[in-house]
Amino acid sequence: GLPICGETCFTGTCYTPGCTCSYPVCKKN
């Protein structure tokens, strides 16, 4: 629910644990 995980997810995948893709950026749950 929180911004921001420091990566984009244009590929649809977030590599940071605990983060999900909220296109086009990863966000913490």
UniProtKB/Swiss-Prot annotation:
GO biological-process terms attached to the record: defense response
InterPro entries: Cyclotide, Cyclotide_moebius_CS, Cyclotide_sf
Family matches, as SUPFAM superfamilies: Cyclotides
Keywords: Disulfide bond, Plant defense
Leader sequence segment: none
Claim: Iron is one of the keywords in the record: no
Cross-link (Cyclopeptide (Gly-Asn)) at residue(s): G1-N29
Tissue expression summary: Expressed in root nodules but not in seed.
Keyword Disulfide bond included in the entry's annotation: yes
Pfam families: Cyclotide
Cysteine disulfide partners in this protein: C5-C19, C9-C21, C14-C26
Maturation and modification: Contains 3 disulfide bonds.
Described function: Probably participates in a plant defense mechanism.
Family: Belongs to the cyclotide family. Moebius subfamily.
Domain-level remarks: The presence of a 'disulfide through disulfide knot' structurally defines this protein as a knottin.
The name this protein goes by in its record: Cliotide T18
